[in-house]
């Protein structure tokens, strides 16, 4: 800053005359630098002037993002950039053969004003698994966590305040940048991570959803349904648009082998509650291993003392459940009030007005852990600021 430079010039002019004054001025300047840096840090921590309660779930560019490149068998040092644009070769593997994976996690402002992330180590591990399945070089776990920390710190002003109902959604992704004209893995890749503030994933928030059983398949048997890759989500777009046009909030995808078992929706896992209060989650090799579902299972067992069963769930048994919800990073838990199966309506006793009692307890407990109002299991919360 200019005021510090002026002090430095004055200091040098008197240095030869009085070393004691030099020491005193040095102390004063160091103190000024500390005060100025503190003020600058406070300014960067000031939240953006946004209507946090009504921002919706959409992309909003923030200040900085992280970029690292893989070439000649190794990742470079990586670093932050303010440029949101990606420039790649016209024959890049991502453009020709959809070689891409991604993750989703959130940063939260807790009750005490800290900024934290929720179980980012699991996102790093899942992304490494996805990379191996698509023949891509895994981005190291520690570097993934460092990238998350850097992006959150650089965009701290974009992390919504506590109690706003909004969060900073973080999107790590990796794609093939090297030119590939034959069907084979690329030799070059780019890892990027950006953040964007978001509100609830579903417009109605906690209002129960109406779903329809889809005629389309999300994944193939022994395919990539368990991998968080863009190609899986591209496959669901037509089904999603068709469902929305018919007035439904989401699709219910069935197992592609027999079309008799519940899998998931286009962007979330299912969670059911029996009339006896038991939590049931569908089990299938083609379902994405949701970190939110895994966390809810732990919360149900260890915080709420509920019985939890993970097993295949038949479409024909849905009317035996008392509650139904969709869970994922974006949605957390969204209640489902009704599922329509080609004219047959399955209405859950929890109704169309609010979350069922067990679903509500699960939601309140998990979000309480994320926001710092409920003590978290060891290792679940990573404090960044």
Language-model segments: what does each one mean?
Residues 4, 14-15:
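Residue-level detector of alpha-helical hydrophobic segments embedded in or interacting with membranes
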Residues 4-5, 27:
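Short, low-complexity, intrinsically disordered N-terminal modules
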Residues 5-8, 40:
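Methionine residue identity
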Residues 142, 151-165:
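Charged, gly/pro-rich active-site loop segments
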Residues 163-171, 175:
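Extended, Lys/Arg-enriched charged tracts that mediate electrostatic binding to polyanionic substrates
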